[in-house]
Every structure is written in C-alpha cells, then in structure tokens.
Amino acid sequence: MGRVGVLLLNLGGPDKLEDVGPFLFNLFSDPEIIRLPFRWLQKPLAWFIASRRTKTSQENYKQIGGGSPLRRITEAQGEALKEQLHDLGQEANIYVGMRYWHPYTEEAIALLTQDNLDNLVILPLYPQFSISTSGSSFRLLERLWQEDPKLQRLDYTVIPSWYKEPCYLQAMAELISQEVDQFPDPDQVHVFFSAHGVPKSYVEEAGDPYQQEIEECTALIMQTLNRPNPHTLAYQSRVGPVEWLQPYTEDALKELGAQGVKDLVVVPISFVSEHIETLQEIDIEYREIAEEAGIHNFRRVAAPNTHPVFIRALANLVIDALNKPSFKLSQAAQIKKMVKMYPPESWEWGMTSSAEVWNGRIAMLGFIALIIELVTGQGLLHMIGLLQ
C-alpha cells in the first residue's frame, strides 16, 4: 500500500485572546457560514460582524482559560490515532488541518505533499455531515486539488460522515453512562442531546442532511445505551435574526424545568473535542439557564477527546476506507450540488410568500450595505454626497 497519511479536519479555534478577532473574521468570511447572494459583500460583512463580536467572544474565552483547547486536543487525538493504527498493523502519518485557524488546512496539505504519500484518508472530525462544517472543508480541498497537479496524482479517499460507526456509538454510550450513574436514581435522569444548530434554510432550502443525521445519531446512541431514560434533542449556538433548527437548547431546558425535570445530563452530540461550545456555552450559560428553570442536578457528558473506544472508532474508519473503493472530493461535492446561495424560485408579484422572501432578502442586503458604509465611511451614498 505504500506510505499512508490521514488528514484530520476540524474547525480550529483561537489559541489566545489576541487571536479571537482574526479567527472570527476567517469564520464569517466563509460563504458556507454566512450565505450571501453577492460574493463582494462577504469580506466587509465578515469584518463588521467580527469587529462587533470580538470583545464579547474574548470575554467568553477568558472564562475557559483565555483560548481554545481544540488544537491541543485534536493533535492529541492524532497522536492516539497513530498509535492505535500501529497496534492494528497500519502505519500512517497524521496531519491536522483546521478550517479557520492554525494549523490551517493549507498548511497540512503543504506538509503532506512533501512526504510523498501513496495513499491519503481525509477524515473530518465531524460525525455528522453539514455544508457548514465538513462541506466547507471539502469545498476548500476541492479547490486545492484543482490547483495542484501533485495532489491530483495522489490516491486519496474521503469519509463524508461516520455517525453510525459502532465504536463511536459505544464510546458515546459509555460516556453517558458514566454521568448518569452519578445520580441516585439513574434511570430517571433526562438525557439531553445538544447539537450545534444551523439555519433552518440550510436544511429546508439547501438540502443539508445535517438534521436527519443528527436525529439518526441520537436514536442510535440511545439504542446503544440501552437504558430507559427519557431523552430530548435540541440545537445550540444560534446567532443572528434568522430561524435556526429547533427546539433551541435554552428553550428546551426551560420547558423541561417547567415539566418538573430535576436531574439532567447534557450530551454534546456534534462535538468530539472540548471547546468553547462545551466549556463555556453548555457548562456555564446553559447550566445557569437550567438551574434557573428548576433543574437542580445538571451534569455534562465529556466530549470523546482521546477516549480509547473513540480512538478505535477513528482507526476503524481509516482502515475501512483504505480497503474500500475510493470516495472522491467530487463525489462529496455531489452532496452540495443541491446547495445554492438561494434556491431557484419563480418571482411572483403581489402579497405572496415568494415575493415576501425576495423582499426580505433585498431589504437585508440594503441594510447590510448601509451598515458597512456607515462603519467604513465608503460607498455609493458617500460617492453621491448623501452621506459625508
């Protein structure tokens, strides 16, 4: 088989407080995160949002030590995966490629092209596929492949999603059991799955399979857990005025509190590493909401991190991928073929839902353009003298 490499893909996170602003700019510059019909708006809007959110985000990172542990944990996962593969008789070089911060995906690609690999497995550390996570990284990789003849000669395969992997499900079940068993009456503990949300339009208009995969994953974990506990699935991390997948985590916690739930375990189902969404959003913000709602016994399941059974799951995925027909980036992109900036709609005049959608989009663009012009002092209104 020759020299084998594994490229682990992840989001990335700021290592220190000074990195927060540039990290947010990179994040919001991605059209898979904020979807606009005009590409030229992307960078100015990203700058505007990042500049407005940096201070608040820095305060959140201060609460977890001043930076994200994501890089450290992901690199530790890579080292553990390398050892596990060695134990299974498969040698491999491991590379970490982050989408929005160091080590960037481009940096990982530069390293692996120097190593003269014969085979590469591209493994996103997102169990469930979404156009805003794995899809964004695949889009970037597809562009890098198109630009580099050396990459085009490399035999590689992609793992689009892997939430059904048995060892992954077993690891999640074990982690949940560890927390549930801390309660006096374990069978009555409410298991609360909190997934990272995405805008509802991603699913309903763009065809993102994320919600379906999250729901299936939740059911499979509960099946593997094989306990009678009631459970709920909700979605966290909503930003902006648009509607995201529901129920929202904060609303679901309040509702469970109103129903009399006292014992609750939160499962961060979208995340395989500790980072800001687990350590600050769940452990601090959602804990406070739950306690105010009357949920007095609040625990959170640890992310898989380097749990041995989880690392075995990653190793199984790599070995299976090496022994199956290759799955190419162009095939992964087929998932995104349905994804357009805005779906095709026929324009209908009058008080129709179609007209309202388009009116809303035009108003949104006008508002964004006005805000950017007011902040930057440059634009059409300044050119014609209406603003000074």
Swiss-Prot record:
Listed GO molecular functions?
A: ferrochelatase activity; metal ion binding
- GO CC: one term? cytoplasm
User: Can you name this protein?
Assistant: Ferrochelatase
Catalysed transformations (reactions): heme b + 2 H(+) = protoporphyrin IX + Fe(2+)
Instruction: Quote the pathway field.
Output: Porphyrin-containing compound metabolism; protoheme biosynthesis; protoheme from protoporphyrin-IX: step 1/1
Keywords, comma-separated and alphabetical: Cytoplasm, Heme biosynthesis, Iron, Lyase, Metal-binding, Porphyrin biosynthesis
Places the protein is found: Cytoplasm
This protein's record includes keyword Chaperone: no
- Pfam families listed in its UniProt record: Ferrochelatase (PF00762)
The Enzyme Commission number assigned here is 4.98.1.1
* Positions annotated to bind Fe cation: H196, E277
Instruction: List the GO biological process terms.
Output: heme biosynthetic process
PROSITE patterns per record: FERROCHELATASE
Q: Which species is this UniProt entry from?
A: Trichormus variabilis (strain ATCC 29413 / PCC 7937) (Anabaena variabilis)
**Sequence similarity:** Belongs to the ferrochelatase family.
| The encoding gene | hemH
Q: What does this protein do?
A: Catalyzes the ferrous insertion into protoporphyrin IX.
